[in-house]
Amino acid sequence: KTFDRDLIKKLEISDHILISIPPINGKDIVIKYFGEVIKECNPKWVTYLSATSVYGDHKGEWVNEESETNPKSKSGIGRLEAEKSWITFTANSKLLFQIFRLSGIYSNQKNILVRLKSGNVNLINKKNQFFSRIHVEDIANVLFKSLSNFKSGEIYNISDDKPSSPEEVTLY
C-alpha cells in the first residue's frame, strides 16, 4: 500500500506519536503500514489509545489497571490484540511506550443530551452494568500532561471515577 510521501516525511521527524486508529478486523494497521518508519525515527513518546472494553464483563465489580482482561465484544478483543501488538513491537524496537485505556467518551457534540434531543435513546436497565465516562477535554489534558510525565511500559485507565448505570446517566 502506498501513502502520501508528506505523511511519511512527517512521521520520520516525529518525536511524539499518538496512535488513536482503532484496529481493523482485529489487527492494528499502524504497525503494519508504519512500524518500520516509527522504529527508525525513534520517538521519545509513543502512546496508544485503547479502551476499557478490554476488561469485558466483571459483573458490576470495579476494574483497575491490574484487573484481568477478558473482552467479549469484537471491539474489545481487537483493542486487546492491538495493545499486545504494540507492547511486542515497542519492546523489540526498544521504543518508549504507554497505553491509555479510555472509558465512554463524550463531548459537547456527543452526549446523552444530544441523543435525547434527537430521539435516539434507549433506556437500558441491566443489573450490575456500570460504566465510567471521560470528556474529550479531559483526554486532551491527560495527553498533554503525559508529554512531560511519561512512564514507559505503563497502562492507565482514563475515566471519571464515577461509574454509573446507563439508566442513571439517562435519567440524570
Residue ranges and their predicted role:
Residues 1-8:
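Glycine-rich, highly charged phosphate/nucleotide-binding loops
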Residues 33-74:
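Conserved Rossmann-fold NAD(P)-dependent oxidoreductase catalytic core, especially the SDR/UDP-sugar
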Residues 87-131, 136:
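NAD(P)-dependent short-chain dehydrogenase/reductase
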Residues 142, 149-172:
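Mid/C-terminal beta-alpha module of Rossmann-like enzyme folds, strongest
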Residues 8-48, 84:
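NAD(P)-cofactor binding segment of oxidoreductase domains
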Residues 18, 47, 98-100, 156:
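Hydrophobic/aromatic beta-strand patches that form the interior of the parallel beta-sheet core
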Residues 4, 25-27, 55:
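Short glycine-rich, flexible loops that bind phosphorylated cofactors or substrates
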Residues 59-99:
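Catalytic helix-loop patch of NAD(P)-dependent Rossmann-fold dehydrogenases
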